[in-house]
Amino acid sequence: MSALCIATIAFAQTSREEIDAHPNLAISTHSVYAGALYAKPIAEAPKGYEPFYISHYGRHGSRCEANAKYSAELVKAFDFAEQKGLLTAKGKEAKALIEKIHATQEGRFGELTPAGAEQHKAIARRMYQRFKPLFKRGSIISSRSSTYTRCILSMAAFNESLKECEPLIETRLVASESDQKMIRPTGPIANEYHHNIRHNIRHDWNDILDVWAAKQDFSHATNALFTDIEPVCAHLGKSKLELISSIYKRMAFMQNLGWHDRSLIDSIFTPEERHAIYKYENYRIFCTYAGTSLKDSDRYFATMNLLVDDIVKYADLAIAGKNNASADLRFGHDYYLLGLLATANFNEIRMDYDYSDVDKLAEVWRSHQFITMASNIQFVFYRHKKSDDVLMRILHNENDVTLPIASDTAPFYKWEDVRKYLNDRAASFRK
């Protein structure tokens, strides 16, 4: 369904205004956790209801870059440019910074950084403060993780923080191959999907993005860095946008290492160029991992059904008094959290937008608001003190979100309604 003209969100700022105010967000899903920027008070529970169970899925926190090849490629590019006499004085400064960023991550690519651990500790502290009845003495907290080290250490940091809040809770941490099909997409369909991405199998959206990219002007950044960028692009086999975007992302990624001096990057890239890079990344992420409006996307989102099934299963057990854990926590990856958001299709986080216009998409779907490092979703269940009546709410990045479900108590819903909605959504992708 095309939804560009019927967006259910009314953003207070344009995407340009938002990125200008918070330039670190221009690298989209690679930005540090942005929850604090959008924090709002959550709704009070209806009278008589108390929390008794929480189900959670969180992306790992800030990490080193996933693969050495990204920064290594730029080190080689700047070496080539220097050898050919193509670097400006500013380009030489950028070369030194890129080399420093690469060297700092050497041997640690893909690993959690201290900033990432602290993000999860802070989220855990806020979870404890909001839902203290779930973390009283003797409570069991069950956590499962992707087998990637960054996810395991995110899980450990989260649980360590909960134990600091209440030392007498029992934390059970598991990172097992048996959980991986639930924690992250696996199987033939997901593997085929990721293979196509890695090997640049063309889709219709690639053509749309190419036409848009050809109209973008990066002359300030290119002239600031190089006396002539064309030989560097030819040497790497990349377009001008691909090279300039990669340079920006590598330099801006330093926020995940705890470095926050933007003076060099902001002297190279104009606000217009920064915003164009953001729109490029935003569009690519929507079309790669989030948009349910894309052709054949249902085949990929069908791989999320095991996570939906797991959430439903353990919630049902908790309601029936057969789940001895008061919290089921899961630690995984950005693309699976995006898949869960696509399945839920919250009123505030629609995933069914038209993708025919790169600029317009950035005004209705903004990746940095949905999926940064440590982004998370929390399903919180409440029971009435004097009955067995159960309501639940959903928090995305610690803020209330709503569903297209009738409720007199929104953002609180009857679990049976949410259960049916999630199962129906998941089933629609299974077909």
Briefly describe each language-model feature range.
Residues 13-140, 146-328, 332-431:
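Signature for phosphate-centric chemistry
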Residues 1-15:
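Bacterial Sec-dependent N-terminal signal peptides
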